[in-house]
Amino acid sequence: MIVERPSLERRVTTSLDAGRIPVLLGGCGSGRTSLLLRLEHVLGPGRSQYLDVAAAATTPERCLAAIVDASRLQPATGPVGVPADTREAFGRLLDFLDGATSTEGTPTFLLDEFLDVRTFENFPGLRHVQRDLVARLAVSPTRFVLASRFTSRVHRLLRDAPARFEVIHIPALDAAEVESMAHLFVSGRRNGAADLAPAVTALVGGSPAAAHILLTGLGSMGAATDPVAALAAAIAPDGALTARCRECYELRLHRARGYGALKGILGILADTEPLNLTEISHRLRRTPGSTKDYLSWLEDVDLVTMRGKRYAFTDPLLRLYVRLYGGPVPPGDSQIVGEVGAYARTRLLPAAAAPALAPAPAAAAPPDPGEAPEHAPRSGIIEID
C-alpha cells in the first residue's frame, strides 16, 4: 500500500524546483520507497525514473547494464558501450545519470537506498564511490531525489557536501494521517477510523508500515476492534509485524560490525533502558573501551540512540521484538499478551505509567570518563526535520 502524503510531496518538489537535491531519511517502514514511487507518479513517467540501488548494486558492470535496460530516461549521446573494467563501468553509470534527457522537461532520478553503491568498493579501483557519487550529483544538470534508511551514515557522508543537498527527515504519521488510512479498513463502522487512529498512531510510533499492519488486523476483527489485541496478533510468531521487525533487525545488524556483541547489548537494553556506558559494560562484562566501540557501531546503523550519555533503542517496536524474540525459545501466548500490555501502557498512558514503569536509578553508576558527549551535527547541508 502506498500512503499518500501531499504535504511531504510538496516539500520535496519545492526543493527540486529550487535546484536542490532532497535527501529523504527514515527508518524501516517509514515510507521512503512509497514516497519515491508517488513522486514518480506526480512528476510523470516521461521525465522521472525510480531506481532501487540496493537491488541493482551487484557488480559495477551488471549494475550499469541493469539500470540502462530498465530506465525510461536515456542519454542523448546514444547507447552506453561495454565498459573495459569496473572503474570504467562506474564512470559510465555516473555519465548515464548525468546525461539523461527527457522531452518533457529536466529529467529526475529517484534513487532509493543510494548508499548501497558502497558495494562497489569491494572491486579494484573503487575506493570512495559514495563520495564520488555525491560529488558528481552535486554538479549535475539532472535532478535527483535520494533516499536511505541509514540516517547516521548519510549525515556523515554529507558533512562536507555542497549546500545543494537538502536533508529531509520523513516525519512520523500523525493521528489525522492514520485516520485517513483507517477509512480504507473500517469505513463501514460509525466513527471507527476517528476512534482508532489515536491509539494506532501511539502504538506504532507513527510508522506507516506498522500502522498498515495494525489497521489490516483491525479490519478483520469485526465490530469489536481492539488496537492492543491487533498488535498482539501482529507480533505473534507468524505475525506480519514480527516478520517486518525481524527483517529490519537483521538487516541493520548485518550492516554493522560485531554481530554477536551488538545483539548482546540490544538484549541488555531490551531488559532495561536507558543505560549509560558504565552500566552497559558491567552487564556485558566487557571493558568500557570495547563497549563504547560496540555502541558506536549500533549508533552507526541507527539501532540505538544516545541522549544525555544514556543509550536506548531508536525504534520502540524493535525493542518489543527483542524482548519477545531475543531468547532461544519463541514466546508463548501469555508472554506476548504480557509484553504487549506493558508496551501499550507506556505508549497509550505515558504520564500515568512512567512512575510505575521507570527503572530505579543505578546506585553507583559514576560518570565514565570514557563516555563521549553528544555531538551536535556539523554540516553545511540544509536540514529539515
Please state what every model-predicted region is.
Residues G19-L37:
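Walker A/P-loop nucleotide-binding motif
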Residues S48, T58-V80:
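Conserved NTP-binding/hydrolysis module of P-loop NTPases
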Residues I170-D195:
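Conserved small helical "lid"/interfacial subdomain of P-loop NTPases
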Residues L318-T346:
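Short, amphipathic alpha-helical interaction segments positioned at domain boundaries
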